[in-house]
Amino acid sequence: DVLLERNAALVMTRVSGFGQDGPYASRPGFATIAEAMSGLAALSGEPDGQPLLPPIALTDEVTGLAAAFATMVALHSGVGQVVDANLLETMFQLMGPLVSLYGITGEQQPRLGAGLPYTVPRGTYRCSDGRWIAVSTSSDSVAARVMGVLGVGDDARFDTFEGRTAHRLE
């Protein structure tokens, strides 16, 4: 605050676990805590498995990027201000509408492994030669081509998103 009083154009960026104020502001903040509290860990993993944490410093890295971007925007504005980035809010942003949906409906998206509820099939698959491929079919036209390559292009169960979702495990 003293620095801002001396230089009204100053942009200060603060990065913390839970923000500068509020009930958790004084608590230690670590990426693992934010990943658990945001629901990311609960959402990650196989349907019948335990919650999983990301195998990289995802929260730290993404929060750093968000803070850097917000700082650049603040500098571009020419108006002095404090940029307050924190680990938990950054993870809530990554969770997209899932947090709001849970708050409104009480429904939690189930763990789908590498799958997404709106893209079927999606995942990594071992080929007959032992190598791996990554597949994501976010539209019916892409799914039709993938199903054709797999030899099930004429199977009506996989023609529509609804059909592919109903037969996700096949």
Model-derived segments and spans:
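Active-site-adjacent "lid/gating" segments in soluble enzymes
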Residues: 2-133, 137
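Aromatic-enriched alpha-helical interface/lid elements that frame and gate functional surfaces
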Residues: 121-170
